[in-house]
Amino acid sequence: MGYGKILVALDRSELAKEVLQQAIALGQKESSQLMVFYCIPVDSQDLSIYPSFYGEAAIGFSQIIKEHLEEQQTEAREWLQSIVQQVQEDGVACEWDVKVGEPGRWIRDMAKNWDADLVVLGRRGLKGLAEVFLGSVSSYVIHHVQCSVLIVQH
């Protein structure tokens, strides 16, 4: 079974470089198309408490959050465009996308909507209570996507 479409879910960690290299190598071997994806992590529940908790002050606060997210999106677009250029120089077809929200859910949705054959992502290595309380994007993805998943670890 080949991997014609590979979704590469990156974060801004050092491990992301290894994730990308693994995906490029696979893309070269399989003649795949890559979708390099980054999600600016924002928990929607966190944002929803501000208006009710802070009342009128939340309006100004939400404007600050909006500006900060726009700045992060601009930085992410520039970062992803440079990655796509690198991937294409390595001879692999590549595109990119960026979203804001919960990474696991966006990766799931991207894999489904883009019809990915494989998702490649890293793993922080959380164990025990840390994984339970902080959550694990890789664990969520493994349990919620319909395609194969490659987890890259340190």
Swiss-Prot record:
Gene3D superfamilies: HUPs (3.40.50.620). Belongs to the universal stress protein A family. This is Universal stress protein Sll1388. The lineage of its organism: Bacteria, Bacillati, Cyanobacteriota, Cyanophyceae, Synechococcales.
